[in-house]
Amino acid sequence: MCISDSLEAGVDLVCFSGDKLLGGPQAGIVVGQLELVELIARRPLARTLRSDTLTLAALQATLTHYLLDEAADQIPVWQMISAKPETLRAKARRIARGIPSATVEAALSVVGGGSMPSQTLPSFAVRLSGSTDGAQSVATKLRHADPPVVSRVQDGAVQLDVRTVLPRDERMLRKVLLEHLS
């Protein structure tokens, strides 16, 4: 159930995180009946928990994307969640091209976090197999690269879910893979 559904159903207060699925800065947000929100704001503890101006500015920018109906295009977490499988397959192929032992395979992305801990989405991954070092060793090598590459080991191979690779990071990821796997 989304926040607006909860409020429309008559819930007095809803507390949620500004990061996670909202895609903004890390912040605790309280919405609901004005008199209750004001009551919370007047409590002495609220002063120690309030957000600073930078957090509020980042939150305002994030919420503006929602108001302009551009969250899916402008907020990275929603770019990742809304990516189409055919787009992910093409991205995986671009990343895997020319990398020894790299293949492209269907995968499942776990949205994760406290908001959607078991929600999965169809995805594609670059599978790195056939290494004489073993999958754990390859994963460790990639984690210690500059920049680090976080992967998962599944079925004896390293798997890189491309859903979490932003377009601006594709070239850098290929560079790291070529440097450490050739």
List each language-model region with its residue ranges.
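Conserved PLP-dependent catalytic core of the aminotransferase class-I/II
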Residues: 55-56, 60-112
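Conserved C-terminal alpha-helix-loop-beta "cap" of PLP-dependent enzymes
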Residues: 89-173
